[in-house]
Amino acid sequence: MKINFQNMCSLRKISCGLIFSMAISLVACDSDNDEEGGDNGDDGLVEDTSIPGNSIVTVKQNRNIILHNPLSGWVLYAGIGDGLSSTFWQDYDNFPSSEGTVKVSDYANTLYLRGAWADFNPEEGKYAWNSDCDTPSAKRLKMLIEGAKQRNMKLAFTFVVDSRDKHYNFTPNFVKEADAKGYETQTGSVKVWSPYPDDPIFQKYYEKFIRALAKDFNDPDKVQFVSGSGFGKWGEYHSVWYYQVRELGKPELPTREAVFDWVTDLYSQVFDKVPVFVNYHRWIGTSKEWDGNNYDKDTERLIGKAVAKGYSLRHDAFGMKTYYSTWERNFIAKWKYLVPVVMEGGWVKNSHGNSIQGDGYANYAEVRQGEFDEAKTACVNMMDLRYNSDFHNGEAYSWFNEAFQLVKQFCTEGSYRLFPDRISLPTTISNGKQIEIAHRWNNFGWGYCPTNIPQWKNKYKVAFALLDTKNDKPKYVFVDGEPEACDWVKGTAKSYMFTTRVEGVGAGKYMWAVGIVDTTKQNEIGIHLAVKNNVTSAGWLKLFEVTAR
């Protein structure tokens, strides 16, 4: 397959609709009534009077198809502690819903593993994902990783170090035994130990663990994202206690900022191919658990520092009106379409029970609707299906049985849903001659495709292919270096003119096709389009036949 990467070609970006102006009646492809993809092909071609030798093909979106694209869709939760069901995959492959049994991986394309650092790193230099580690947690991890692979799901991680509210130490015992400074708290009848994150011994071992993790998991083929902190209660980066502050009485901000800088530097440096996320809430890194409508004045600045290093944003209390309120809404509105957002609901049916009534919810169907509405306002790319060992009282069960329509609605309206509604291409091409391709792109999801994050820089690009008419495989690929999918947001179409030279193309008939390719993988399709008809098994959208001379 010959590749023509056209970064330096003569390109001109022009305003939406100009290149497609014509005195004919066409279907409005940005209508909200469009459903199934139309038949793209010679019968639907219209001569392009503005580009001699070109014809225009129109494409309809498909609103019903579930797309499993990078950093999009539902996230299925799991852990590797003792509470994990021994029949996890069997349970989720035969999952009860309000409409019958479903396979959850048909809806979710990410498996999120949130757990104790101690479970992933039980001994110094020994890691649960390696073959030489055979602890019960390691066996569960390997089972989950293999099951995710079989279901074409990618992984995501959060590693919690704080043992407060836990029934065992979440930081490995060898860290404590190395004289790292920490503190003890009581969880029921159990006394647990947590490290101070400003302690240099803790930092040495934690950094060693994260670097070992990145060695095997800084791989976008395996991993969807990593949460790049895990400090404080529940790993959400609030209620953080520091040695310099709690034991020595020093001001909090200098220590807090030094720890924040250290950990965000660490993750952003070692995970340069996989997106990393930091929580956004009004008390990032402070010792406060909460304080009503008050907020910390340095939080927004610190989160901004993380974003500047390549971090994206997540929040873990969507739908909780105390913890996701005016400050959080105003904050995330400033980052709309600038960084991707991942959501997690806050209410836990099994433990919170009727406490939801304090937020005005009558039942958990209303909770799910509240989470969904906040997620839509925040333009999130990913939503959560949390795990609970009490299966029928878990959040995943609640979504599929009390709000299944919202599960499906997010699949077809949330994240990003990209497609080109009109493309103008030449009907004949000749070697040594320039061609012009005009194309217009839309996004009908409420999120965005974050090609602007550094981990994805120049990774996903629009490409046009000449397919072999016998097997639909690309023979020649032309990559347009100009369009950025991050610019495509709902309600605004973007138009481009791509000029390139044809070289080395064998004479004969081919099929024009379009797709969004992964340039790091020899221009294989990297993002699937929101279309259905005339799509090859590899993901190319076939357009019409072209003759090469």
Report residues per predicted region.
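Extracellular/luminal regions of secreted and cell-surface proteins that mediate adhesion/ECM remodeling
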Residues: 412-549
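Aromatic-lined substrate-binding rim segments of carbohydrate-active enzymes
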Residues: 100-185, 256-275
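Aromatic- and acidic-residue-enriched segments that line the glycan-binding/catalytic groove
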Residues: 164-188, 238-250, 292-299
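Bacterial Sec-dependent N-terminal signal peptides
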Residues: 2-3, 22-55
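N-terminal secretory signal peptides that target proteins for export/translocation
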Residues: 1-11
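Active-site groove signature of glycoside hydrolases
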Residues: 182-202, 206-247
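Catalytic cores of secreted or luminal carbohydrate-active enzymes
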Residues: 368-425
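Catalytic-core regions of glycoside hydrolase
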Residues: 48-95, 149, 228-235, 241-392
